[in-house]
């Protein structure tokens, strides 16, 4: 009797392991669509101003997705201490000579198409001052965004293929020096003012 009970329990445990393994395997067997580039081309061809505005209402700007990876591709992350530290080389790029300098990164997100998008990142939080340690409390650097059309993975897997839907990504194009806005009375905002992105 004891041996039979042990044998029965062994069968139950093995069955559970096989079942769980099958569930795990079925959960990961999902691949990218083979026509993803074609889907994107069709989306770009059919996009209009009205549906762009519709997508914009549900899009978010600023911040980085938890699974998004960035690689520095041009420039450096060092914020100049004063305008004297900014290059005057005529061959230099505008974003190296601005009072809100920025660098370029390759943003990679596996659940988006195109998966790699080149974006700007601000080097400084405040505008570069004329003199050393002369940062003003009246100005700051803010990102400048431009909406770009993308396809975003929905999370659904149909017949082993990931599903994508039209979306809009707020691409950071650069940084600009702006005067800080004053908090509205009763808004509860701090002295830094609005953090809304600046559209291009």
UniProtKB/Swiss-Prot annotation:
Which UniProt key words apply to this protein? Disulfide bond, Glycoprotein, Secreted, Signal
Signal peptide range in chain numbering: 1-26
- Keyword Cell cycle present in the record's keywords: the answer is no
Q: Where found, per UniProt?
A: Secreted
Which Cys-Cys disulphide bridges does the record give?
122-175, 127-177
Predominant localisation class: secreted
Would you tell me the protein name for this molecule? Interleukin 17-like protein
What does the sequence similarity comment in the record state about its family?
A: Belongs to the IL-17 family.
What transmembrane ranges does the database entry give? none
Glycan attachment sites = 46, 192
Q: Does the keyword ATP-binding apply?
A: no
**One cellular component GO annotation, for this chain's record?**
extracellular region
Pfam families registered for this protein in UniProt: IL17
Give expression by tissue: Expressed in several tissues including hemocytes, gills, mantle, adductor muscle, labial palps, digestive glands and heart with highest levels in gills and lowest levels in adductor muscle and heart.
Induction notes from the record: By bacterial injection. Levels increase strongly by 6 hours and slowly decline through 24 and 48 hours.
Name one molecular function that GO assigns to this entry. Answer: cytokine activity
């Amino acid at each position: 009797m004891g041996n039979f009970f042990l044998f029965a329990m062994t069968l139950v445990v093995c069955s559970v392991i096989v079942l769980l393994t099958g569930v795990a395997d079925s959960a990961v067997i999902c691949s990218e669509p083979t026509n993803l580039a074609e889907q994107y081309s069709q989306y770009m061809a059919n996009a209009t101003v009205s549906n762009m505005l519709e997508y914009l209402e549900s899009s978010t700007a600023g911040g980085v997705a938890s699974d998004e990876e960035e690689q520095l591709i041009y420039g450096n992350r060092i914020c100049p201490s004063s305008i004297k530290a900014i290059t005057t080389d005529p061959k230099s790029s505008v974003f190296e000579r601005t009072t809100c300098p920025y660098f370029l990164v390759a943003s990679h997100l596996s659940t988006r198409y195109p998966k790699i998008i080149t974006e700007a990142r601000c080097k400084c939080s405040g505008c570069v001052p004329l003199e050393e340690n002369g940062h003003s409390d009246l100005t700051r650097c803010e990102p400048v965004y431009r909406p770009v059309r993308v396809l975003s993975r929905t999370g659904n897997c149909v017949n082993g293929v990931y599903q994508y839907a039209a979306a809009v990504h707020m691409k950071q194009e650069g940084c600009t020096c702006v005067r800080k806005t004053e908090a509205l009375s009763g808004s509860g905002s701090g002295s830094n003012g609005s953090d809304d992105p600046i559209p291009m």
